[in-house]
Amino acid sequence: MRKTVLLGIVLAAAVAGAEQVVDISGIGNKKFTVSVNVGNAAFAKCLQKNLEISGLFIANPNGSVKVTGNVGAIQAVGGGKSLSCTTAFSDDRSARMAARQFANAMCEAWGQQKGFALDKIVFLKHGKQHAVGAAVPGDLCTCYADGYDIRQLTNDGKMSIFPRWKDENTVYFISDRSGATQIWEMNVATEQAKRKWSFRGTPTGIAVSPDGSKVAAILSFQGNPELYVLQGDRYTRLTETPFEVEGQPTWSPDGKKIAFVRGDRTQQIWVVDVATKKARRLTSRGGKNLDPDWGRDGRIVYIANGGQIMVMEPATGDASAQAVTTTGGWKHPSWARDGRHVVAGSGKSLFLVDTLKDGDKPRAVFNANGDWISPSWMK
C-alpha cells in the first residue's frame, strides 16, 4: 500500500472574494497565484515545485492562495477554500511525501484536477555497450515527477527494457539478467526480482492491464513476433501476421482493447479487441508512428514522424490527431493520471510535457548526468 499521509482537509468559506487568476501566454493559462511560506524548507520547496508542475499554480509572493504554518499545522487559504495539513514529519523525505499529498489535495480543491505528485515514474538509466553486438545494459530507476528522491533499483550490468507498473509496489520488465531474455517481476520496496514468464525467443514489449491481472506481450516463441495476452500460466494469441512485426502494446482504460505498433519497413498504430481479436488501423499519416500510450480519459498519446508528440482519439484515429510538440527527438510518452501531462524522453533527459494548447513548456524532470530513457508513469 502506498504510505498514507494523513491530511486534515477542511473546505470552508475562509476568505471572501475570488482567487487572483493570471493568464500567462506560452506557459499555461489561468493559473492560481500561490505563495508558500512554511517553516520546513523541504516541505515548502517540494510543495511549490509540485504545484507549479501541475499547470494550475504559479508562485507569487503576493499570491491569492497562501500556504503558511509549520510541521503539523500547515494551512492553504484562498478564494473561499481552506485546506489543512496536520501530518507530523521528522526528516526531509517524509516532509516531501507530506508535501506531495498536500499538493494533490490543492490541485483537486482549487483546480478540480487529479494530482500526480505521489505517482512514481519508472525509467531506465542507459549504460554503455561493452562489445559490438552485445546488449546495452539498462538499470531500473524510479523518481517522482518533482525530480526528488531518485532511486536506482538495479545495478547488475544487464539489459532491462519496457519497465511497466503492475501496481504501486510492483514493476514488470524484460531483462536478460539470468542469461535468456525473459519477463521479470520486481518488488520495488525490497528490490527483489523473480522471473515471471519464460518463452523461447525474445519478448520485445509488454503492457499491464488496468486491473493488473493480465499482461499484453510481444512474443516470438511460435515464430513471428505477435501480440499475446498472458494471465497466470495461460496465454492467448491475438494477432497472426507472418509478414509483419508487432510491438509496443498498451491497454485501453477498460481493459477490452490493446493498441500496438505493426510494421517492419513502416510502422503504424493498430487496435485489437481482446475478446473478438478483430483489429483496425488507427494511423495512416506518415510511415513511422510509434510508442502509443492509452490514457485514463481514453486518448492515445504517441510519437509521429520526426519525433513529434501527438494525441488522438481512438474512435477517429489520426484524423483527430493534435500535435503537442514540434518535431524533435521525443520518445516513449507516458500519461499522468490527470489526463493532461505526459512524461517523455528527449535526448538523454526526461521531460514533463503539458498536452494542453498553450500549456506549459516542457520541463526537465531532473538534471543529472546520465542517459535516461523509457519512462512509464504509475496511473
Specify the residue positions occupied by each region the protein language model found.
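Sequence signature of WD/YWTD-type beta-propeller architectures
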Residues: 19-21, 26-379
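Hydrophobic h-region of N-terminal signal peptides that target proteins for export
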Residues: 9-17
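Positively charged n-region of N-terminal signal peptides that target proteins for export
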Residues: 1-4
